Amino acid sequence: MRRRQLLALSVLAPFALVACEGPEPEASSGGSGSAAPNFTYSPKGYDGVTIELDRPVERIAADFYSAAGLAQYGIKPVAVFGFGQNESPGKSFDSTGVEVVGTDMELDIEALAVTEPDILVAYGNEKGDGWTWWDEKVKGQVAELVDFVPVKLSDQTPDDMFAQYAAIARALGKDTESGDIADERKAFEDARKRVREVAAKKSGLTVLLANFSAEMNYTSKTLGIAEMLREDGLDLVGPDSSDDSSWAEVSWEKMSDYPADVLLVHDASVDYEDNPVFKRLPAVEAGQLGTWDDKRAYTYDGYAKWLNELAEVLEGAKQIVEK
């Protein structure tokens, strides 16, 4: 059993050391259910990886997105780090009262050690032995402090991600089937049903998922969120991505080659609104626009809200592109 020590460790380049101050929160079980007498978890997608502790888990560190995914089960971490802190409300984790030990690719190892987490839950790398953006040095430093619990991100649909966080919550002794989470899950399922129903009624409607920027644009038909929309009956258009990426690059000169009845603009898109090519896209001229974001935290309420917004766009859309 690993015991955390307050080591004077620091993360050097390529990570910047950040100072984290403030009150140290206690991990909160919240909700119904009690902490499991010990912790055993075998994460999906990581064959042969099992995390075992011979004691209950009381203190959890997590990346912002995993903190959000677990918060819906009444789990509050003692420390958070990583990407997502500055996302809009409902898309990430509200870190009020929680120690922030790093943002983006920064991590303060010493500050993490002070919070004494029992486990650290975050998007896992290929082996599942560290955060997907850590280098070997940082991964080793963290491994000296705390057991890492990976969440597989690549090739996962939203349903897959929800299932992973539910499995971690169950391993922590949480009730994942009743109470508020059951209501939130039903709202998500109802929103997906609404999308499926409008997709069935408007089977000829085409949809393009795009992330715009001043120099280059990116589209996807194979990201997990895109797979969910395809499962629900949407006809996604756009270029095929390469074998090693879920994204396809599309220059502004080529954007008109992929017309769509409905255009979903990624929330991270920048410097595109005044581009004359954008203004001439059929969906833009028709005002048939919506949003999407593959970086949205995997919470049922957040996804339900977005899916209902999407359904409203689809319900008001017409087929404007000739086949």
Which residues does each predicted region cover?
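Bacterial lipoprotein signal-peptidase II cleavage site
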Residues: 20-32
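N-terminal secretory signal peptides and thylakoid transit peptides that target proteins
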Residues: 1-12
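Structured C-terminal subdomain patch of bacterial secreted/periplasmic proteins
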Residues: 144, 254-323
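Basic- and aromatic-lined ligand-binding clefts that recognize polyanionic substrates
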Residues: 59-73, 175-235
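Extracytoplasmic substrate-binding proteins
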Residues: 140-211, 303-323
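Extracytoplasmic ligand-binding site segments that recognize negatively charged/polar headgroups
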Residues: 86-88, 126-137, 150-169, 204-227, ...
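A short, structured surface patch at a secondary-structure boundary
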Residues: 59-115, 119, 124-131
